[in-house]
Amino acid sequence: MNKEIIEVFDNTYPDRDYTIEIINPEFTSVCPKTGLPDFGTITVNYVPDKSCIELKSLKYYFLEFRNAGIFYENITNRILDDLVEACQPRRMTVKTEWNARGGITETVTVSYSKSKE
């Protein structure tokens, strides 16, 4: 997955804490064990610092996963790491909710918080 695709723009209100929620209800990847497609919803909540994520570039970043064989847990952590690196938010949470396979669903949530220096 090419994280260089992710673009950001300047936050006009860097002195204010506010939350941005981004939802992608059509995320797809491939199960690395079976080769079958996985479908899920990705929710990103973050409090920006100096920059915000540009949505068109994020869409193309998410499409990078479409043919990738990768486990749910790895997808969730990879997205968090890549988005934190791109926009350096104050706080961010990535939640992935996966459609049922064999009658079982899975939700993975991972968070980041910028340390006070």
Curated annotation (Swiss-Prot):
Pathway: tRNA modification; tRNA-queuosine biosynthesis. It comes from the Bacteria. It is found in: Cytoplasm. Keywords: Cytoplasm, NADP, Oxidoreductase, Queuosine biosynthesis. Coiled coil: none annotated. One of its GO terms (molecular function) is preQ1 synthase activity. One of its GO terms (biological process) is tRNA modification. Its EC number is 1.7.1.13. GO terms for cellular component: cytoplasm. The active site is at residues 31, 38. It is an enzyme of class 1 (oxidoreductase). SUPFAM superfamilies: Tetrahydrobiopterin biosynthesis enzymes-like. Substrate binds at residues 53-55, 72-73. Pfam families: QueF. Its main location: cytoplasm. It catalyses: 7-aminomethyl-7-carbaguanine + 2 NADP(+) = 7-cyano-7-deazaguanine + 2 NADPH + 3 H(+). InterPro entries: GTP-CH-I_C/QueF, NADPH_dep_7-cyano-7-deazaG_red, QueF, QueF_type1. Belongs to the GTP cyclohydrolase I family. QueF type 1 subfamily. Catalyzes the NADPH-dependent reduction of 7-cyano-7-deazaguanine (preQ0) to 7-aminomethyl-7-deazaguanine (preQ1). This is NADPH-dependent 7-cyano-7-deazaguanine reductase. The lineage of its organism: Bacteria, Pseudomonadati, Chlorobiota, Chlorobiia, Chlorobiales. The gene is queF.
